[in-house]
């Protein structure tokens, strides 16, 4: 259960704790908070050197993004960047999942960018699990056949 008085401490742990397990758990916990203060730290955590922190941050951004159109757009912009540049397949798959959760809240231009990126991944990615996640996302958005 979220505790409003814990938000600042959790954000501090995410940003400064030396233990990657603590940062990962904190990124996961922050999904329970719908206030604006957690959005930016989670976005910054997408650049963390530990894949598990990036993975859980991307999941939490899907939750925080669903709170408002503004949050959805801010989270989605960074998730799309991470999808394009992250080397870890699990993180990239999770970015696709998170973007798919935010899809309905995004403007048409961004939706098109996401569909284009998923199509490229479904057709050309070197990692089969990421390709499959992109195909699943396209199917869920009603874009069956875009990758055949």
Predicted regions and their residues:
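Structural detector for internal amphipathic alpha-helices that build alpha-solenoid repeat scaffolds
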Residues: 1-3, 12, 21-35, 44, ...
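Amphipathic alpha-helical scaffolding segments comprising HEAT/armadillo-like alpha-solenoid repeats
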Residues: 2-14, 35-47, 69-83, 105-122, ...
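Short inter-helical turns and helix N-cap capping residues of alpha-solenoid HEAT/ARM repeat scaffolds
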Residues: 18-19, 49-50, 87-88, 126-127
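Short, mixed-charge aromatic SLiMs
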Residues: 54, 120-126
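Residues within HEAT/ARM-like alpha-solenoid scaffolds
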Residues: 74, 87-90, 113, 129
